[in-house]
């Protein structure tokens, strides 16, 4: 759900991204009842062309995901980034499989959220062929412990930061390569 000003900014962001040569657009709009805002989402999809459009994880807030999937196909979206309506994709394997089956190759189900090397094989059984992961880890900074918190974060102390976990990324790529080499 976006205000009119926020929606105008999203449209401007899409124009800027296109001018910069990005490979695709990830966005989407819901109504206050957590259904797809058809009119605004259609506007974003049209504005994104010829780039592929991915409807983001707002999809996970939608109650009737199968109906929403069909709406997004009709609107011309190419992909849905989803954890199947749960906090993480591994918690929603059954729903992800259902979405892949319902999509019937008309739209890509891009599983995302909580994906790691120790669960990617289970997610491959859903039929998903694309995955989104952060694969980050908290890195302890060599800086001295700050006497006060400047970032108001209770999750990551100020002297630490998140960084990509190369080992985890390599492990997931290995699992994917192994799976797809057996299923080609």
Regions found by a protein language model. Give the residues of each.
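Catalytic cores of alpha/beta
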Residues: 1-16, 60-75, 97-111, 115-133
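Histidine/lysine/aspartate-rich catalytic loop segments that bind and position anionic ligands
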Residues: 44-90
